[in-house]
Amino acid sequence: ADLLIVGGGFTGLWAAIEAKEHNPNLDVVLVEGNAVARGAWGQNGGFVSASLTHGFSNGLDRWPNDIAKLTQLGQQNLNEMEQFVIDRKIDCDWMRVGEMDVATEEYQVTELQEFVEVAKPYGEELVWLDQAETRRRLNSPTYLGALFDPDSVAICDPARLAWGLRDVALSLGVRIYEHSKVVDLDERGDRVTAKTEFGSVTAPKVLLATNAFPPLLRRLKYLIVPVYDSVLVTEPLSEQQRRDIGWAGNEGVGDTGNQFHYYRPTADGRILWGGYDATYHFRSGFGVQHEHSTKSWPKLATHFFSTFPQLEGLRFEYGWSGAIDTCTRFSAFWGTAMDDKVVYVAGYTGLGVGASRFGAQVSIDKLLDRDTDRRKLEMVNTLPIPFPPEPFKSAGINFTRWSLDKADRNQGKRNIWLRTLDRFGMGFDS
């Protein structure tokens, strides 16, 4: 092959498409250890954000000199994604409906109102909704107001989006091999061989797009950790239940605590409700057994009915957990290995459905040595601070989670541990 891509999630699929559209004569091979969209890309909440930096505030704090450009590139990325879905007729329930970030505590009202003015000079067109308008759109007694972003978020069925991208990649001539787990990379001369359980693929250029899965490069073990986020999906709402809550605009919704929930309506009339608990398992524990853990479900269900008491008695029909590749800066990073023959990208930290396309484009820029503005960004040319080894990693993550929970119960006031992490540009999120 001319280009080998390891990983059949959004990053890998977008990269394959990007490479073939750049040069149709490239022989592009994509290998996936399970099935396309089997990982986080098929299990996530289905929010497609324009943000490339896990939210505007995170980007402003870390890359103030580039945030205007990053905001513009993120909006362009979302617009191009939407046009791609339309042009390629990908049936994935795509809706450009925006997002409401709701305040459920008084201190959050002040923070969100101030944020409108902070973000405005950088092209963020945000609208403050008072309590009455917020509850007119979506009726919860917990809402005190909301920040509405009308244009920077879409919602979709992520698995069907990934399957659509797979079909496009195949139509362009990409060779896709599923159930072909890569177990080792071997550098020989000017080529790299990826060994699977059933054979091998050799190429001069390799992209590692495995994200939360156990990494093939040792260095990535210290840059990302897998955390598990849980989702519940209700049975379809009756017409009366839908009238009771409203939601005519179908907006995506998130609350604004440190430990937050995200939720959206589905095309078949259900509510997808997820978030809050981001669970880390000792020694970066990873596997199917964690996807079926029901530990967080009762807590999520309690929070759901606290938000929508008028839906008491509604049943949850589905639930699952999926792994997120979190890093200390909460957003994607890139690097190279084996004399630049291998490029890796990871660290989306739970906001990667949209950002993965950008991540793929930057990766192809690097692999094909394309001179683009994207490659000059500080974000693209820096790495996150590594996590410490065990047992310090587990202790630090769990103490951070405890501190975030304490802050949520104390008007958002961050203790000395969280303030220290903030000072050094570190943290834990999903």
Task: Set out the residue ranges of the language-model regions.
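Beta1/beta-strand and adjacent pyrophosphate-binding region of the FAD-binding site
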Residues: 1-11, 29
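C-terminal lid/capping helical subdomain adjacent to the catalytic/cofactor pocket in oxidative enzymes
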Residues: 18, 22, 338-343, 349-430
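Glycine-rich FAD pyrophosphate-binding loop
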Residues: 20-43
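Active-site substrate-recognition segment that forms the wall
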Residues: 46, 87-95, 182-184, 190, ...
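Dinucleotide-binding Rossmann-like beta1-alpha1 core, especially the glycine-rich loop
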Residues: 51-133
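Helical element adjacent to the flavin cofactor pocket in flavoenzyme catalytic cores
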Residues: 110-120, 142-205
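General small-molecule cofactor/ligand-binding pocket signal
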Residues: 127-130, 175-177, 315-319, 343
